[in-house]
Every structure is written in structure tokens, then in C-alpha cells.
Amino acid sequence: MKKILQISNYQYPHIGGIEQVARDIADSLLDDKEIEQKMICFNEDAQDGDYLCHRKETVHDSVDGVEVIRCGCFAKVASQSLSFTYPHELKKVLQDFAPDIVILHYPNPFVSSFLLPMLPKNTKFILYWHLDITKQKVLGKLFHGQTLHLLERADKVIATSPNYVDGSPYLSQYRAKCEVIPNCIRMERLTPTATIYKKAELIRKENEGKILCFGVGRHVPYKGFTYLVKASKLLDDRFRIHIGGKGELTQALKEEAKDDNKIQFLGRVSDEDMIAYYLACDIFCFPSITKNEAFGIALAEGMYFAKPAVTFTIPGSGVNYVNLAGVTGIECSNGDVQAYADALTKLANDPELREKYGKAAKRRVEEHFMYDGLKRAIWDLIAEM
């Protein structure tokens, strides 16, 4: 019997990229009766139906049959949650549960500051590297030494793309420890129902004769939606651009686009509506501009629906590993609004190219970024340890 402890930032019902990967890993191990697992994370205000979490509470519950220890938080600084109870809860689970393998989802500077002294020498340590600390430059410098200690202690470092290994100033120094396990999408979450097909048909009918472009994500600087809005101004009236999501830049984006009738802001998009727009669109727009976009799950999802993608070049990011320039879509120079508009126009003018890239996009996702692939890779990884 192997015991595995995952250290995630948060967990369902709070859903972000890291949390989804942690949940996928936990799900992938449920079928192995020789594995016992637990998860520890920060608590956060979040709700999904009757499932309700409160940030300040420390609670033990379960998700998908896996025990989750949620540590109450008293503050959040530079996106990092802070908790008085976390050190005690972590020490307790390390002693009582005595995991054979600990998986730390990085970055998590707060937990990293006290994890290593608590970690028994014979415990295998997997550092699951989601992204470099790039936005908070002061924090990055402050925790430089800590990060090196984590990498030194790690028995294995998991990256989500070879691009990130090559482009990270940290991972590139520890290539021998690195293994690439791409993030994944799950087919069952993206299977259209009859209702969804009807919604997609309605979207097409409402925009008959138009080239539909769809982009979705949080409205924050690194997502690059301001560049998509600017590119729209350079397009002709054949185009309709639907932008899903919300965030700190939503109002600024709407102000920027107020005289552009080609753009429609959808707000927060339900899972059903998201699939409907994936189905209905002609082109998937993914305008992220920095390495904070380490991979691009929404990009992979759009490609899964056989849509050509238009992305920017982001050195060291997995975005350009997911969308292959000239194979599954078009890649534009970073932040080049004119090039982005030209790429959309090129695809609009060439239905055969759209179909060619779209088919290749779907094939690439099916071959490299599906849940079954992640599950096999995680099983192999655990077997090695």
C-alpha cells in the first residue's frame, strides 16, 4: 500500500488550473486499490450547489472520495493565502498519515517556507511545477533560495510542457529531474447534449453569414484580451467576436470596445454555454501574452472541437506547445495587434485552411492532451517512486 499526499493551493469547489490538475491526479489514482491518498490545501470562499466552503474555517471533508484538509486563511497577499493553522495541519498529516510520496503543486511560497524541515528524509518528493513566479518579481527574488532548495530535495520535477522546461531559469538547471506530463482535458466534461447542440445552432443562426471568433478566460492582464479588442478594430464587418469571462479588466475592455459592434461580452459562461460556443465558433482566439499562461486548458478545449487557434508567441510557455504554428493554427508575434488581425482575416478568407488546421487541432489534443494520457503518466510516475 502506497500513501500519497497532495499539497494543492485550493480544491473543489474552488476551481483553477492547478486545482483541476490536482483533482485529475487524485481521480486517476482512485482505481488503484494499492494507493491511499489525502490532500491538504487552503480554504477559500467557494460554492457549487450545496457544496459550500468558507475561507476562514479549517475543515476536513472529502472530494470524489479523497479526504481534503482545508486550512482556514486570515489573509491573502500577492495572490498567496496565509494561514495560522496550516503548519499544524501539515505536520499532523505527515506524522499520522505518514505518506510515502508527497506531491507539492508549485508555486506555493507559504507552504514551501516550512515544508522541507517537516518532510521525513525517506519520503519521496514530487515537485509539480505549474509556472515560474513571474508577476510578483519581489516575491520571486525573496523566495529564490527556497525554490532552489525545493528543486534540490525533489526526487522528480513535473512540468506541463517541454517549452516550460527549456524556458524556465530554474527547470533548465534541473533537466535530469524533469519529466513532462501535459495538462489534460476530460471528454466527459465536454460532451454536448441535445440542448447544447440547439444552443450552438441558435448562436450560428443569430450570426448567420458571419465569421465567429470565441475567446474565454479571466479578464486579467496576462490573458491579453485587450489585444483581441484592439485587433477587432482592424477587422471588417464579417466578424463577430464573443468574449467570455469576467475580471478586473472587464470594464476597461468594454470601454475600449464601446464603438465596436463586432464584439459581444458574454460575462461568466456556464459549462453548457461554453461548449455551445466552442461548437458554434469558426476560430478560437487565445490572446495570452505572458508565461503566467503556462499551458492553456481553454486553448486545448477549443482545439478539441476542431477549431483553428490563433495565439501569440510566448517564449517559454506551453501555449505554443499546445497550438503548433502552421499545423493547428496561427502564431503571431507577441502583442502584435496587426498580425493578430491579419491571422484572423487569413482564416476567414480560407475555409479549407480553417478545416485543415481544425482537424489537426482536434487530432493533436486527442493524441497528447486527454485524461487517459495523464492517468497513464501518473501511474507510471508513482510506480517509479
What residue spans do the PLM features occupy?
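Nucleotide-activated donor-binding/catalytic signature segment of Leloir-type glycosyltransferases, i.e.
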Residues: Q251-E272
